[in-house]
Design a protein with these regions (language model features):
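Short, surface-exposed amphipathic charged segments that create phosphate/polyanion-binding patches used
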Residues: 29, 70-75, 125-130
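PIN-domain endoribonuclease scaffold, especially VapC-family toxins
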Residues: 9-10, 18-67
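A generic local structural motif
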Residues: 1-2, 42, 80-82
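Active-site neighborhoods of divalent-metal-dependent phosphate/nucleic-acid chemistry enzymes
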Residues: 54-99
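Short, glycine/charged-enriched secondary-structure capping and boundary segments
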Residues: 1-3, 28-30, 108-111
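Short, well-structured N-terminal submotif of metal-dependent ribonuclease cores
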Residues: 1-16
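Hydrophobic/aromatic ligand-binding patch that stacks against planar heteroaromatic rings
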Residues: 4, 86, 104
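Acidic, PIN/NYN-like endoribonuclease modules and their adjacent C-terminal/linker elements
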Residues: 15-17, 89-93, 99-130
């Protein structure tokens, strides 16, 4: 995953909800523990991984898009509302391996997903952007 984020800027543009930065910050202690890294090392790793991601505030998305996204994920995983709303608003794919989410939304006609394996294959088979 790190390779895709760090080495794909010539091929892809990554966007994410701004709250994702806050989520990473909240989990610094756990990240230090499971990685065995000091806080400064975790912060540096975060910088390297996140520097190619454009973080966008949710205020840019229309209320109607939020409502549509909420309805789609209500019985699957309401915590994924942000990702569906961003995908619909920016007309982009959701990078995910969450099979429950992907299958649940596919049953409702929403199939705008790409997996890590698909991203690697796509990058391998495409030319860099100018």
């Amino acid at each position: 995953i790190g390779d895709l984020l760090i080495n794909s800027q010539k091929y892809l543009e990554f966007i994410a909800p701004y709250f994702l930065r806050e989520e990473i910050f909240k989990h610094y202690p756990r990240l230090c523990k499971i990685s065995g890294m000091a806080l400064e090392q975790v912060r540096e790793s975060e910088f390297q991984v996140c520097k190619e991601i454009t973080f966008i505030s949710e205020e840019q998305i229309k209320q109607s898009t939020w409502l549509t996204a909420e309805k789609l994920v209500a019985d699957i995983d309401p915590k994924d509302t942000h990702y569906v709303a961003y995908s619909k608003h920016f007309r982009c794919k959701i990078w995910s391996g969450d099979k429950v989410l992907m299958n649940g939304l596919a049953r409702k006609g929403f199939t705008n997903f790409i997996t890590t394996d698909e991203l690697f294959k796509w990058r391998q088979n495409n030319e860099p952007r100018p």
